[in-house]
């Protein structure tokens, strides 16, 4: 017989690319009900009959506590600094012809961070990390027939990412990149 202690997730995932995406916990790739298809499935834009503009934001204020051994061997509680994140999403869908459709999106695929007291026990791993990317995504969709469409897009990513720790890890500041 095996046993384990409690396990808690410590990662992050953003599904704030549209209201339906959030409601379906990100299980939205095969759907194309609105202009957020720019992010999930550009080919789906070809099946949308009307031009549209779609935008929004989400308020995220995480509260995280770390319980770990202190120098004296007891479990010490350290709380992360309170922060507010507001990932955005904005999409435009425009039908050029009946079969060719253009989409453009601006959104945060990642938009969270952490900040701890510089004297906390995990300071050699991380004091501050920030991953807030801005995606600019032009897309095209072509409706082949009533059951098939194809789509393509490009992501231009602005990623002001930084990571700070104490002593043995290297502090990193990464600036914008271009990916296709």
What spans do the regions from the language model cover?
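Subset of outer-membrane beta-barrel
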Residues: 8-180
């Amino acid at each position: 017989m095996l046993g384990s202690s409690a396990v808690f997730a410590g990662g992050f995932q953003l599904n704030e690319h549209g209201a339906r995406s959030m409601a379906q916990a990100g299980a939205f790739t095969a759907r194309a009900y609105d202009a957020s298809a720019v992010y999930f499935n550009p080919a789906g834009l070809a099946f949308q009959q009307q031009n549209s503009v779609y935008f929004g934001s989400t308020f995220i204020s995480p509260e995280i506590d770390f319980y770990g051994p202190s120098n004296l061997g007891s479990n010490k509680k350290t709380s992360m600094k309170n922060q507010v994140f507001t990932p955005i999403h904005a999409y435009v869908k425009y039908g050029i012809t009946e079969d060719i459709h253009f989409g453009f999106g601006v959104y945060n695929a990642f938009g969270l961070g952490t900040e701890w007291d510089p004297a906390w026990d995990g300071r050699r791993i991380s004091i501050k990390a920030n991953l807030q990317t801005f995606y600019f995504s032009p897309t095209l969709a072509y409706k082949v027939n009533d059951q098939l469409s194809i789509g393509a897009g490009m992501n231009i990513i602005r990623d002001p990412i930084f990571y700070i720790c104490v002593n043995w890890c290297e502090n990193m500041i990464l600036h914008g990149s271009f990916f296709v």
